[in-house]
C-alpha cells in the first residue's frame, strides 16, 4: 500500500480510515492528484474555499499544505471521510482550526470564492449537491470537479447546466479530467421528497439523495425482511441501516426492544430517523448514530441481535474490509448468546468470515443471488 502522496511539490503521508496496513487500497486517487495539480498550476486559488467529497483528506491536506491559514469549508456525508481527514491532518502536522465542517444537509456559506469537488458515484446525490451550491454561490464562482475520464460525458455536463451553470472538461491526465463549472447565480429549488410504501409491512419510507435504493425496496432488504429471526430481543442494532427499513420492521415485531440505527452516511441516519417518526414508532425506542460501524456506540448498549446488509464499496473502491469490520464489531458488542443476522451476495462468501470469527455459521435462506447467514456469539 502506498502512503506517500506527491504532486506538484506537495508531499503528504495519507492513510485510509480505518487504516488497513495489509490493504492494497490507498487514501487518494489520480482525480485527487489532477485536481490539486490544476489548482496549483492555474495559480487561481481563492479563499474561502469549499472542499466537497474529499475521501480521506487528500484535497484538504493538500490545500492546507500550500497555505495552513487558508479557511476551508469541508463537506462530507461519510463519517469515515470526516475521521480520516482529521487523522491525516494530524499525521501531517497540519492545523484543524482552519477547517469548518459541514454535512451534505448543511447550508454552506454564501461568501465562497472557490469550490473543489470530487464526483460522487451517485449522480442524484451530485445533483443535490450542485443544487445546494446554486443557492449560495454568486454568479461567476468557479467549481472544479475531478473524476475519471470515462465518467465524463455530455449527460454529466447537462447535469451541471441544469443545476448550477455551464461547464467544460479539461484534457485527460492519468485517465482523469477536471470539469470547470461557473455558477450562473440562479438559485434552484431542491428536489421534492419522494415517499413510497412497503404495503406488506405497512411501512412508509423516504430516502435522502445519497441513500441506497432511492424509491423502492432493494432485493437484499426484501429477502432479509422475509427471513428475520424469531426470539425475545430487547436490544437490536441495524448496522449500515440505510433508510432504516430493517430496524423499522423489527420495531413492529419486537415493540419492547430498543432499536439502534448506525450508518457511515449522515443522510442515511437522517432518513432512518425521519422514517421512524413517519411510521409513528415510539420516540424513546429509536436511537440514531452517524458512525464508523460501532466504533463510538455507547458502552451500555449490548445488543442481542445485530442486523447487517454490508456494503462492498467504499466510494469507488471495491473492498470487503467494511463487512469484516462490521462482523468484528458485532462479535465484540453482542451479548453472549446474541445473534448476527446478515444478507449478502452469494459470491462474497461471507460464511467463511463468520465461521472464522464466531466458530459457527448457519444458512437461513438463499436464492440465486443472495444468502441469509446467521452466527451466534458463544
Curated annotation (Swiss-Prot):
Catalytic activity line of the entry: guanosine(1835) in 23S rRNA + S-adenosyl-L-methionine = N(2)-methylguanosine(1835) in 23S rRNA + S-adenosyl-L-homocysteine + H(+)
Keywords for the protein's UniProt record, in alphabetical order: Cytoplasm, Methyltransferase, rRNA processing, S-adenosyl-L-methionine, Transferase
Single GO term (MF): nucleic acid binding
Superkingdom of the source species: Bacteria
CDD domains: AdoMet_MTases
Subcellular location: Cytoplasm
GO-annotated cellular components: cytoplasm
EC number, UniProt record: 2.1.1.174
Alphabetical list of Gene3D superfamilies matching this protein: Vaccinia Virus protein VP39
Similarity-based family: Belongs to the methyltransferase superfamily. RlmG family.
Protein role: Specifically methylates the guanine in position 1835 (m2G1835) of 23S rRNA.
HAMAP family in the cross-refs: 23SrRNA_methyltr_G
Protein name: Ribosomal RNA large subunit methyltransferase G
Amino acid at each position: 500500500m502506498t502512503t506517500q502522496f506527491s504532486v506538484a511539490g506537495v508531499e503528504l503521508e495519507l492513510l485510509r480510515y480505518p487504516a488497513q496496513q495489509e490493504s492494497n487500497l490507498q487514501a487518494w486517487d489520480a482525480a485527487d492528484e489532477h485536481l490539486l495539480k490544476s489548482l496549483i498550476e492555474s495559480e487561481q486559488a481563492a479563499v474561502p474555499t469549499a472542499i466537497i467529497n474529499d475521501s480521506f483528506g487528500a484535497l484538504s491536506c493538500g490545500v492546507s499544505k500550500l497555505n495552513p491559514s487558508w479557511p476551508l469549508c469541508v463537506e462530507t456525508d461519510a463519517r469515515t471521510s470526516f475521521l480520516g481527514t482529521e487523522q491525516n491532518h494530524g499525521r501531517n502536522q497540519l492545523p484543524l482550526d482552519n477547517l469548518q465542517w459541514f454535512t451534505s444537509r448543511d447550508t454552506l456559506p454564501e461568501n465562497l470564492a472557490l469550490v473543489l469537488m470530487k464526483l460522487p458515484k451517485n449522480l442524484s446525490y451530485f445533483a443535490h449537491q450542485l443544487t445546494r451550491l446554486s443557492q449560495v454561490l454568486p454568479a461567476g464562482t468557479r467549481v472544479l470537479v475531478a473524476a475519471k475520464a470515462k465518467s465524463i460525458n455530455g449527460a454529466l455536463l447537462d447535469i451541471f447546466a441544469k443545476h448550477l451553470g455551464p461547464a467544460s472538461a479539461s484534457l485527460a491526465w492519468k485517465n482523469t479530467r477536471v470539469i470547470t463549472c461557473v455558477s450562473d447565480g440562479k438559485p434552484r429549488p431542491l428536489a421534492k421528497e419522494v415517499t413510497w410504501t412497503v404495503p406488506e409491512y405497512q411501512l412508509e419510507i423516504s430516502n435522502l439523495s445519497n441513500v441506497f435504493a432511492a424509491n423502492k425496496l432493494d432485493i437484499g432488504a426484501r429477502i432479509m425482511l422475509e427471513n428475520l429471526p424469531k426470539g425475545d430481543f430487547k436490544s437490536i442494532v441495524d448496522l449500515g441501516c440505510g433508510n432504516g427499513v430493517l430496524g423499522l420492521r423489527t420495531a413492529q415485531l419486537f415493540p419492547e426492544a430498543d432499536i439502534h440505527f448506525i450508518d457511515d452516511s449522515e443522510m442515511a441516519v437522517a432518513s432512518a430517523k425521519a422514517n421512524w417518526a413517519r411510521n409513528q414508532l415510539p420516540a424513546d425506542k429509536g436511537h440514531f448514530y452517524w458512525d464508523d460501524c460501532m466504533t463510538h456506540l455507547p458502552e451500555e448498549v449490548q445488543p442481542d441481535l445485530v442486523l447487517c446488509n454490508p456494503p462492498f464499496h467504499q466510494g469507488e473502491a471495491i473492498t470487503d474490509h467494511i463487512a469484516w469490520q462490521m462482523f468484528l464489531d458485532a462479535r465484540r458488542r453482542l451479548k453472549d448468546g446474541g445473534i448476527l443476522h446478515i444478507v449478502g451476495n452469494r459470491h462474497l462468501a461471507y460464511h467463511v468470515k463468520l465461521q472464522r470469527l464466531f466458530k459457527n455459521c448457519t444458512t437461513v435462506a438463499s436464492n440465486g443471488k443472495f444468502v441469509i447467514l446467521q452466527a451466534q456469539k458463544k
